[in-house]
């Protein structure tokens, strides 16, 4: 079986502010030729391309095994005459038993097998069906159908329920459950033959990821919002399938550490390009309207509609995925002097396409969190507003949303920030907020409490229960928890804390609790604070400090009833360092301790 490769073709890609016309005119936002990407006029940082290869081997999954379902599937095969098609009827009842495989007069092979699993993407769909006989194993239908790779390139699912049930199904798979959808699906699949390319939309740094450490579970934000099922959990991190990823960008927006970043365009490119657009306008830009487009024609139509309704001081920016622009981008624009940002999630007002998914809801939560931080600085409420769709109500109220021209506005007279922090999400956000705090008069606020799930905060600790075992330090992925090096201390840097919860999971004493908040003073936030410290315990022989007194006392108390520590000399060894303990054992007896021999019990 041949697997398409994630090729490392560097390309200067345009998506973000002027969507690629060639990519958007393609049936599934895929590009057939590299040249189509290189022609773009708006440049961003290099990214790689993901390649798909389709030979046109299509599997049609019928809606049952009765005559009507088979007839519908055969009509689809006829409509896709340019493809090599097979039909799978997953229902084969005892009342109407059918042979496992039959050939129609038109030469179409129909399989009557139980469908167990369907996974993959354009050019590589693996279809597993139940094996014949009493053996409950699975067989690969592509191998039975003798396709070249043992896989199917395309799948048309006519069943009542989608076999691949995700918000954004993979390229090459279409679920159609009504006549119009079936007709459109046949037309689209017929065009999906050949080689296709799309950008690799993401960059992932495992070392920054707070998903898991040492088989402990922490942050799962990206998994919770992924609309394609492209993200999966692995040991000490996550894994993203670039062939399933469709670039919605929500994973990067909700990532607390910046381990997941959007690459098409990168955050730094998006911020710099937006600043250039702000500076290129003949008059001051006080508002931004960020809206999604899927093709060049739609971009023009939507832009004309929006621009006709927006005041002159508002800049409309077209983006292929508005969900990829998160709190670091919004805060940077506010620091650049923008007084209102509206983000449109869906270009269409169609009820089915505007159903709020986990990513849409997460975007609203991110905006709400940043609005709380900005309002605490004395700025107006709801400076960032998420709009679900461009319906009549939204259109009618656009002008009112951007009534921010007042000379008394808190941002009036504040210089525009122009920092660049090279895709460091947390540093970018803090730099933007620091800039606002330095120039706003109402900057006496020390901190603001945030809702659960926020990526900023501190830790509270039960000092009486903490033994300074440092399990939390070894687990923290962000360097927020530190040991005292030569002294028994637990230190904490609030600016680094992701509130991922890995430290709480690792703590054997359950003494750590998270307190989400934003600390405005960056000096204090970056200063290491002592959470707990104990008196060091010195070895009773060599006097070297090797533990804390509390740890030795706890250990002595817990082991005092154990049969191996019934003699005073055994308990005494607990108060020795590792070197002196070994010396003492072999000094006392040449044979050492027989750990298998229990002392005699008193009669």
Regions found by a protein language model. Give the residues of each.
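Short helix-loop-beta junction
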Residues: 77-81, 303-315
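Ferredoxin-type iron-sulfur electron-transfer modules and their immediate structural context
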Residues: 2-224, 283-298, 375, 381-482, ...
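Cofactor-cradling patches in redox/metallo enzymes
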Residues: 128, 329-386
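Iron-sulfur cluster-binding cysteine motifs and their immediate structural context
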Residues: 202, 217-241, 246, 250-268, ...
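Short hydrophobic alpha-helical runs that function as membrane-insertion/retention elements
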Residues: 84-87, 317-318, 340-345
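Non-catalytic interaction/regulatory modules that flank or connect domains
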Residues: 314, 321-335
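Helix-enriched interaction subdomains in cytosolic or periplasmic regions
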Residues: 1-37, 232-269
């Amino acid at each position: 079986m041949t697997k398409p490769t994630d090729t490392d073709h560097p390309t200067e890609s345009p998506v973000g502010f002027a969507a690629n016309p060639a990519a958007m005119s393609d049936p599934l936002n895929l590009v057939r030729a590299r040249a189509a990407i290189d022609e773009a006029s708006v440049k961003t940082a290099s990214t790689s391309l993901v390649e798909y290869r389709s030979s046109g081997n299509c599997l049609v999954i019928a809606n049952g095994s009765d005559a009507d379902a088979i007839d519908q599937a055969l009509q689809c095969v006829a409509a896709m005459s340019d493809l090599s098609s097979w039909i799978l009827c997953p229902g084969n009842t005892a009342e109407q038993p059918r042979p496992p495989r039959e050939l129609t007069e038109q030469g179409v092979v129909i399989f009557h097998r139980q469908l167990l699993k369907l996974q993959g993407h354009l050019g590589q769909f693996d279809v597993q069906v139940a094996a014949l006989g009493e053996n409950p194993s699975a067989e690969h239908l592509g191998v039975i159908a003798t396709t070249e790779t043992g896989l199917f390139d395309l799948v048309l699912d006519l069943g009542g329920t989608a076999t691949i049930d995700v918000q954004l199904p993979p390229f090459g798979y279409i679920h159609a459950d009504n006549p119009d959808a079936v007709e459109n699906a046949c037309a689209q699949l017929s065009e999906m033959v050949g080689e296709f390319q799309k950008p690799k939309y993401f960059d992932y740094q495992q070392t920054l990821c707070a998903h898991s450490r040492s088989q402990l579970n922490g942050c799962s934000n990206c998994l919770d919002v992924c609309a394609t099922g492209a993200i999966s959990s692995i040991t000490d991190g996550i894994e993203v399938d670039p062939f399933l990823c469709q670039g919605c960008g929500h994973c990067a927006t909700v990532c607390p550490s910046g381990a997941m970043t959007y690459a098409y365009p990168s955050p730094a490119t998006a911020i710099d390009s937006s600043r250039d657009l702000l500076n290129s306008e003949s008059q001051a830009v006080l508002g931004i309207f960020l809206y999604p487009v899927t093709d060049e024609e739609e971009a023009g139509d939507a832009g004309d509609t929006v621009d006709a309704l927006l005041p002159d001081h508002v800049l409309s920016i077209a983006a292929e995925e508005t969900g990829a622009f998160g709190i670091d981008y919004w805060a940077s624009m506010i620091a650049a002097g923008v007084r209102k940002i509206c983000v449109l999630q869906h270009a269409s007002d169609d009820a089915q396409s505007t159903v709020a998914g986990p990513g849409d809801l997460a975007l609203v939560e991110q905006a709400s969190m940043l609005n709380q931080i900005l309002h605490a600085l004395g700025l107006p409420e709801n400076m960032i507003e998420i709009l679900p769709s461009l319906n009549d109500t939204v259109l009618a109220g656009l002008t009112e949303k951007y009534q921010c021209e007042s000379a008394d506005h808190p941002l009036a007279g504040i210089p525009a920030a122009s920092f660049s922090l090279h895709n460091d999400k947390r540093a970018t956000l803090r730099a933007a907020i620091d800039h606002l705090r330095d120039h706003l008069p109402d900057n006496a606020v020390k901190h603001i409490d945030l809702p659960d799930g926020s990526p900023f905060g501190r830790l509270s600790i039960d000092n009486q229960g903490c033994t300074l075992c440092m399990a939390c330090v070894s687990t923290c992925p962000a360097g927020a928890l530190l040991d005292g090096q030569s002294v028994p201390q637990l230190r904490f840097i609030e600016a680094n804390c992701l509130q991922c919860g890995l430290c709480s999971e690792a703590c054997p004493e359950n003494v750590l609790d998270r307190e989400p908040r934003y600390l405005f003073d960056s000096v204090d936030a970056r200063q290491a604070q002592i959470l707990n410290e104990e008196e060091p315990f010195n070895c009773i022989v060599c006097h070297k400090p090797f533990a804390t007194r509390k740890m030795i006392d706890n250990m002595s108390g817990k082991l005092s009833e154990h049969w191996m520590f019934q003699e005073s000399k055994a308990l005494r060894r607990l108060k020795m360092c590792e070197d002196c303990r070994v010396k003492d054992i072999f000094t006392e007896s040449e044979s050492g301790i027989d750990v298998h021999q229990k002392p005699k019990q008193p009669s």
